[in-house]
Amino acid sequence: MLEINGKEFTPDEDLVIQGDEFSACDIEQPAVIRNPFPYYDLMRQKPIQYGVRGYPPGTVQGVDEPIPAWGVFRYDEVKHVYANHKIFSSQDRMQEASEAPSMMLVNHDQPEHTFLRNVARQAFSPKRVDQDVAPWLAEICDHMLETEGPGNVDFMTNLAADLPARFIAKLLGTPADEYRKIRQFADAYMGTSTQTTEEKLATSIEFNEYFTYHVNERYKQIDAGTAEDNLMTGFIVAEDDDGKKLTPEEVKKFCITMVAGGAESSVFLLGNQIVSFLEMPELYQKMREDRSLIRPFLEENIRRTGPIQRLFRECLEDTMIGEQEIKEGEWVCVFNGSGNHDPSMFENPSEFIMDRPNVGKNLTFGHGIHHCIAALVARNEAAAMMNGILDRYKAVEPGDGEVIFQDRNFINYGPATVPVNFVPA
């Protein structure tokens, strides 16, 4: 038995290192990935430690060699790293050295990042989200829920995994019937796939080739005047104040960022949300009667069980994080999920508090210039699914089977399976 912040906690049996001996070197274990929050409580009480060895997006476990990093767990220190982007670089030399293609927008610094982000911001403006994105999502959710029907279902496999992939295929203008490829690409790229090492590497290469083909075809369609008005087309035709446009390689980079980040994290956001329904059935009934509660419910879920758990940064000069000196060239790993559970920022952080006054200060989608550009879309995906379920079913009950959380990669927190029983209204 271990005591953390006055609370008793029994570590999972398969945890290799337990109790006070637990350190940053031990964090990337399946038992911790499944439920990291008690271990975050422990790590926030310790000095910043060296030795986190994880896999950034796009790297392949068993092929690439992790670079040890300083683990940053306290809210103020996580935010400090994000805010000081000139010191803590997003350029990912581990991913760049990987045999898998290096294409993530989050792995780029100024000034390239600013130009790329400004192009993307046009696509995700609140006006466009309201006019185009929200109706698309409602339509997709209606179709999926109508097809699935009431009764027992694995929410993750049948609904959560498909919604973001279907939406991204529509957003980018790739063939609608290939949305399952989008999901497969995202799983492999973000490290949560059940594929073998060789299969993950092959899928990452196929991922790159898939969008190389579709981007090249879109350029041809634009030249011929036959291209549809969608996000990929917008990436190609957008230009900055000096008339500069994205290269085909940068357009591909955007598409892969959308798939790898949007498809994977949104899946776990949806899954964590449905788990909250199962944990708090009384809130489900309240939201059926008052849909204005959806947003605060969603925001507290994003803080308390937000999917994105950690990201890496490289230090560009000697600096300090708190009382710890970080040398130029060393890596740091910021744990968003730990910051969201820091009691110095969020009172009683493990509790679900619907009207939490500072919930908007959560770090799930990052902070500063690297705040996720698609966060508004992710929120709309979650809201669309919630509204669709609330419209059709008077209750969401535990289904046949066990809720099992994924334990393959620390990038995202969330369930692999959630059996539910949809009770028709």
Regions found by a protein language model. Give the residues of each.
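Cytochrome P450
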Residues: 1-425
